[in-house]
Each structure stands twice: as structure tokens, then as C-alpha cells.
């Protein structure tokens, strides 16, 4: 892609990170960069209809020069942090429409959409979206997690419990692949007043947190030891 507007996009991206560094309350540069990115892609597709059909292909076709995926994640995070939920919802919908998302991909975007809808009080809409998503991807734990939050908001506790029972096979074993749904289950049991089930889930979450803390502490120690190994004084060398 040799669209001259990429230079303008790059400048706007720089403005976005300056915006972060200075804690500016103005989010215009993020929205401007997002809209310009859409504009560039749609312009390219006028002459090359199949260009950038997926986000990963866009990165490849721009030689990974702009870290578009990384910037988009930061952009969505920023809208979320600023509680700009209408803008966040629109961005998620635009990205889900702009690119192709094969099954079991785009889960982060779809979860963000559900949470944006819930934050806007559009609970039934969030519930309906999660149901359609889970129907297409019945083993997607991200869809189920989003669904549990939607069930809490709509007070559909029967459906929420069904999701927990199906996706949490062992309530005592929380790990990297299912910690998000354990967190959702904890919120669910808090909402339903099931103290016994919440205590069991929270115990598993705590055990996993302690495991992670120990793991990263040991990794830090190993890195420190490795640095010491290579910190050799010149006088200790066997020869000049």
C-alpha cells in the first residue's frame, strides 16, 4: 500500500501517544486516526477489492510499518478508560464490519462490544448479541464469559448458571485458559447471593493468582542470576 495518507496516519498516531503521555482529556486525535485508517482501507479497496480482507493481512500489506494492531488495541483501551462507550461501540462495530473474522477470531472485539452495550444500559441488546455469537462459536469461552455478564445485567440467572456449569468443569482449578470465566462466575455468584459457590470460585482464583506471583518472581530471580553470570570483571578473564 502506497497511499500518501499513511504519513498523516503516522503523525496522528504519534499525537495519540503524546496525548497519553500528557494525560490530555481531548481524545480527538484517536478518533481522527481511526477514521483516517478506515478511509485509507476503503480507498484502497476501490481499486483492489480484496485488499486487507483481514487485519493480519493489512499488517502484512503495509510491511508491519505502523503496528496497526497494537495501536488499535491502545485506541480501544483508551476509549474504554475514558468511558466513551458510544465511540467504543462504534469502533468495535466498524472493525467487525471492515475486516473478515473467521470463526473463533475477533473475540476481544466482540467482548468489548458486549461490555460497551452493557455500560450503555443496552442490556437486552448485549444479551441478544452474545447469544448469536455463542450459537456460531459454541465452544468459545470468551463468548460465554461475555454472556455471564449479560445474564447478570438481565437477571437471567438460569442461563448464566448453564454457562458456568458447561464451561467450568472443575470449580477448583483455575488457569490461564479459563481465568476470565472464573472472574465472571465470581461476579455472577455475588449477584445471585450464592456465597458457597462464590467462596469456592474465589479460592481457585486466589490460588491461580498466587501461582502467577510465584512464577513471575522466580522468572525475575532467574533473569537477575543470568545478568550476574555475564557481569565479569576484566581482571577475572583468563587471558588478555
Locate each region found by the language model.
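Alpha-helical adaptor scaffolds
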Residues: 65-173
